[in-house]
Amino acid sequence: VKHGNRAVSSSCGSADALEGLGFPLDVAPEDVRRLLDERNFAFLFAPNFHPSFRNVGPIRRELGIRTLFNLLGPLINPARPTHILLGVARPELVELLAETLRQSHIRKAAVVYGAGGYDEVTPLGPTKMMIIHNGRLTPMSLDPLDYGIQPCNPEELAVHSKSEAVDVLKNILAGKGPRA
């Protein structure tokens, strides 16, 4: 179950990409279980589940920078997952968010800060991580070189539009994705 929104600080957010792949965003909360059972995947479009946040969307887009809502979103996933992968855009947030998850209903999680300032694992270099399991925090690093992956540069990861991001995703799903 993926919980997300449209792009705010990038050219394509998870909702934009999934919409481009043909996933409907206007799914009513009561239909999510059926979709999950049918497809083994469901996308929870944040504005459908948190109507009061709709008012801040235009302000966030106008600001064009990360805000508290980037951190809050994964923490208020209405599916209340017990396992989660959470990316943060600043290294000092890894431990803070890991501790927050440790004190919640989460049983197992990874909080990641990717090389290059990304809120996800990247092939740019080592990813700082904190694993939460059975109430314990374990710091670790994930280096692409350890898996035979040569680091790339940020330009190789960049997409400049929603349509480009969707094309890249389609190629990845077809087994023809880019190196980075």
What are the functions of these language-model segments?
Residues 19-26, 31-180:
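Glycine-rich anion-binding loops and their surrounding alpha/beta cores
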Residues 1-26:
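Substrate-binding N-lobe of the ribokinase-like
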